[in-house]
Amino acid sequence: MRNINAVFLKQVKETLKNKSILIQFLMFPVMVIIMENAVKIDDMPEHFFVKLFAVMFVGMAPLTCMSSIISEEKEKNTLRALMMCNVKPLEYLVGIGAYVWLMCMAGSLLFAFCGDYSGADFFVFMLIMAIGILLSELTGAVIGIFCKNQMSATSVTVPVMMVFSFLPMLSTFNETIEKVAIITYSQQINILINGLGTTDIKPESLIIIAANFLVSAILFVIAFKKKGLE
């Protein structure tokens, strides 16, 4: 537990130094504040930008941050130094994961406030965001572990991130894309957020999210056993 706390605090201290990571945490929360207050269009669904950017935030920020942090520290041999200080690989990953998850959940609070969620809807919204963020973290960790350096991680992260963050938005305009996107967790997060307070949660959404989690967990185990953090 002490090592996990040390890794967590290390990342917190480096937040302001790592501008690319900081931008990921702040970009969509800042955008939603601006767009919700600056753009008013007739017949626009209530809190349209909150729902749109919340889903994009889930698909982009945690995934990008996890892959970037892991691959960067592998490249700089920071991980090797941590291993020599008796920090176990899983302790490192839990520490990094907790840091990214909490930072993203802080951003989720801004989405919740901008969306005027209250009572049960607030807690359900935060739960949906928490699950989506965790899934994206797993995916980002797989990429970070598999890739040798930050450049190769970025080349893999960008297309994967675009799939999970942009498919839900594109699916609203194209039925064919919607049929493809339906199997992704980010699209199910999109469905759950847009139906919050108006429709019941469908079992299909929970099954697809669970299936996505299982696939991500299996890939994580494979990546960790094959590559480790060396």
Feature annotation, model-predicted:
Residues 59-64, 94-95, 120-128, 173-176, ...:
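Short alpha-helical transmembrane interface motifs in multi-pass membrane proteins
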Residues 1-21:
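N-terminal Sec/SRP start-transfer signal
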Residues 46-111:
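Hydrophobic alpha-helical transmembrane segments of multi-pass membrane transport proteins
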Residues 19, 131-167:
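A structural motif at transmembrane helix-loop-helix junctions in multipass membrane proteins
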Residues 26, 35-37, 191-230:
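Alpha-helical transmembrane segments of multi-pass membrane transporters/translocases
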